[in-house]
């Protein structure tokens, strides 16, 4: 695995969590699972050719890594990006196995994509690319086999083209993709799911750490990002009585000591569709004219906020460094939960985990919610979309939201139980590690299914 650094990193994280626990001592048979679960059940590589707008033929490499189906049909996104390669897709597919297991829904893990740059390509050419990609992929997927979703480069438009291609090639309308349009099989609450789910998970953390005495009410929350996840997380925090003191984009961040309002977040959402930066939005929109809003160019919010209780990184990977983590701890942060995948660097996670493991009581601890658990709301609602498709029904927004909340709370409880049951930590006065809890809980779920079905013997 040395030539696959991304995959190796994901594998090592799971291994270190389960090895640094009592699990192999209690259940030696689980040791046999590691070498088996680390090898994909199937890797499909295929040629994708299409005609560009100049009438010339182009070719790219397509992939689908069908990693593990012990818990259900393979489930994971399709990525159309020039960085797509087998190591990255194996890393993402491997992570997906365990994230999907934590939802409690019947979903295995997989990932796929195409090594292509869609920038500058017309709608027509993108449609031809999607049809060419699905021409081969359609042989290997199905509602009970493999149900892909979107990812980087594959949004609602591309999902539409891919679904249309599948329907055309197979002469079958079935829930073979998630993230579909609402009037052709999609689910309500899908755009909100990751942000809402993140807040529900964080609420469960607060509830547990304070024995139900505290909630988001009055808490100061620093959020990074201003896309889908950040917007809906911020709106849910405000709904629950929290104060959102920051948002950011790739060019800088906005800080508001008195709190960003839901009206301002709606303005940011509508402006972001037109690709406006936060700097432009703060200058141009009347909702920001009288508010005490500070824009900091070229910065992330972590070192510019003070007296914060909760941090929710929702922008991109490695956006919280070790030094920024120390700044957050110094500013009083007690809860950190990741809306972005790998939002914190290993150094930052070490800072948070050290602040937790060395605390003399739960009140002084800093608690870190890992992305594997904290941001699984998106894939959870994808699973609920599959359930609705299988019944040929559409649930109300209230029902989907209720199911999402239940999934996030159950996931949190599973992480806590695994951390407590299998922990080797000496300090029992502090809070348990949710990083280890998420890794161990998800590993046990997948391992049990593989052992029961004879994948491991």
Swiss-Prot record:
<dbReference type="Pfam" id="PF00208">
    <property type="entry name" value="ELFV_dehydrog"/>
</dbReference>
<dbReference type="InterPro" id="IPR014362">
    <property type="entry name" value="Glu_DH"/>
</dbReference>
<keyword id="KW-0521">NADP</keyword>
<dbReference type="InterPro" id="IPR046346">
    <property type="entry name" value="Aminoacid_DH-like_N_sf"/>
</dbReference>
<keyword id="KW-1017">Isopeptide bond</keyword>
<dbReference type="InterPro" id="IPR006097">
    <property type="entry name" value="Glu/Leu/Phe/Val/Trp_DH_dimer"/>
</dbReference>
<dbReference type="InterPro" id="IPR033922">
    <property type="entry name" value="NAD_bind_Glu_DH"/>
</dbReference>
<dbReference type="GO" id="GO:0004354">
    <property type="term" value="F:glutamate dehydrogenase (NADP+) activity"/>
</dbReference>
<feature type="active site">
    <location>
        <position position="111"/>
    </location>
</feature>
<dbReference type="InterPro" id="IPR006096">
    <property type="entry name" value="Glu/Leu/Phe/Val/Trp_DH_C"/>
</dbReference>
<dbReference type="GO" id="GO:0005739">
    <property type="term" value="C:mitochondrion"/>
</dbReference>
<comment type="similarity">
    <text>Belongs to the Glu/Leu/Phe/Val dehydrogenases family.</text>
</comment>
<comment type="subunit">
    <text>Homohexamer.</text>
</comment>
<feature type="cross-link" description="Glycyl lysine isopeptide (Lys-Gly) (interchain with G-Cter in ubiquitin)">
    <location>
        <position position="436"/>
    </location>
</feature>
<feature type="cross-link" description="Glycyl lysine isopeptide (Lys-Gly) (interchain with G-Cter in ubiquitin)">
    <location>
        <position position="372"/>
    </location>
</feature>
<feature type="binding site">
    <location>
        <begin position="175"/>
        <end position="204"/>
    </location>
    <ligand>
        <name>NAD(+)</name>
    </ligand>
</feature>
<dbReference type="InterPro" id="IPR036291">
    <property type="entry name" value="NAD(P)-bd_dom_sf"/>
</dbReference>
<dbReference type="InterPro" id="IPR050724">
    <property type="entry name" value="Glu_Leu_Phe_Val_DH"/>
</dbReference>
<dbReference type="InterPro" id="IPR006095">
    <property type="entry name" value="Glu/Leu/Phe/Val/Trp_DH"/>
</dbReference>
<dbReference type="Pfam" id="PF02812">
    <property type="entry name" value="ELFV_dehydrog_N"/>
</dbReference>
<keyword id="KW-0832">Ubl conjugation</keyword>
<dbReference type="InterPro" id="IPR033524">
    <property type="entry name" value="Glu/Leu/Phe/Val_DH_AS"/>
</dbReference>
<dbReference type="GO" id="GO:0005634">
    <property type="term" value="C:nucleus"/>
</dbReference>
<dbReference type="GO" id="GO:0005829">
    <property type="term" value="C:cytosol"/>
</dbReference>
<dbReference type="GO" id="GO:0006537">
    <property type="term" value="P:glutamate biosynthetic process"/>
</dbReference>
<keyword id="KW-0560">Oxidoreductase</keyword>
<protein>
    <recommendedName>
        <fullName>NADP-specific glutamate dehydrogenase 2</fullName>
        <ecNumber>1.4.1.4</ecNumber>
    </recommendedName>
</protein>
<feature type="cross-link" description="Glycyl lysine isopeptide (Lys-Gly) (interchain with G-Cter in ubiquitin)">
    <location>
        <position position="326"/>
    </location>
</feature>
């Amino acid at each position: 695995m040395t030539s696959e650094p991304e995959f190796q990193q994901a594998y090592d994280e799971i291994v270190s969590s389960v090895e640094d626990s009592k699990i192999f001592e209690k259940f030696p048979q689980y040791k046999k699972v590691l070498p088996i679960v680390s090898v994909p059940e199937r890797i499909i590589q295929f040629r994708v050719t299409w005609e560009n707008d100049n009438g010339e033929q182009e070719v790219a490499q397509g992939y689908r890594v069908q990693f593990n189906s012990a818990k259900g049909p393979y489930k994971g996104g399709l990525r159309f990006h020039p960085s797509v390669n087998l190591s990255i897709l194996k890393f993402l597919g491997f992570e997906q196995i365990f994230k999907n297991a934590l939802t409690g829904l019947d979903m295995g893990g997989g990932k796929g994509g195409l090594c292509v740059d869609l920038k500058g390509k017309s709608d027509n050419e993108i449609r031809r690319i999607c049809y060419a990609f699905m021409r081969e992929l359609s042989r290997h997927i199905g509602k009970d086999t493999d149900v892909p979703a979107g990812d980087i480069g594959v949004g609602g438009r591309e999902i539409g083209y891919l679904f249309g291609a599948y329907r055309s090639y197979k002469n079958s309308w079935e829930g073979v993709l998630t993230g579909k349009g609402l009037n052709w099989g999609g689910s309500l609450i899908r755009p909100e799911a990751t942000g809402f789910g993140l807040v529900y998970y964080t609420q469960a953390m607060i509830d547990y750490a304070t024995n139900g005495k505290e909630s988001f009410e009055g808490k100061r929350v620093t959020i990074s990002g201003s896309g889908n996840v950040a917007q809906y997380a911020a709106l849910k925090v405000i709904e629950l009585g929290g104060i959102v003191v920051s948002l950011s984009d790739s060019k800088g961040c906005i800080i508001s000591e008195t709190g960003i309002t839901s009206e301002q977040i709606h303005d940011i959402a509508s402006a972001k569709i037109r690709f406006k930066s936060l700097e432009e939005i703060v200058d141009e929109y009347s909702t920001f004219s009288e508010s005490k809003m500070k824009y900091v160019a070229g910065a992330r919010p972590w070192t510019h906020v003070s007296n914060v209780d909760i941090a929710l990184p929702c922008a991109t990977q490695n956006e919280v460094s070790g030094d920024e983590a120390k700044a957050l701890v110094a500013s009083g942060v007690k809860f950190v939960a990741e809306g972005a995948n790998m939002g914190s660097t290993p150094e930052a996670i070490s800072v948070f985990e050290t602040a937790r493991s060395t605390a003399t009581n739960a009140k002084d601890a800093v608690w870190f919610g890992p992305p594997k658990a904290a941001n699984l709301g998106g894939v959870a609602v994808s699973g609920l979309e599959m359930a609705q498709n299988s019944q040929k029904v559409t649930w109300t927004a209230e029902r989907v939201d209720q199911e999402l909340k239940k999934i996030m709370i159950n996931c949190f409880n599973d992480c806590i139980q695994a951390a407590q049951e299998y922990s080797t930590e000496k300090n029992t006065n502090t809070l348990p590690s949710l990083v280890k809890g998420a890794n161990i809980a998800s590993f046990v779920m997948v391992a049990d299914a593989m052992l029961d079905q004879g994948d491991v013997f």
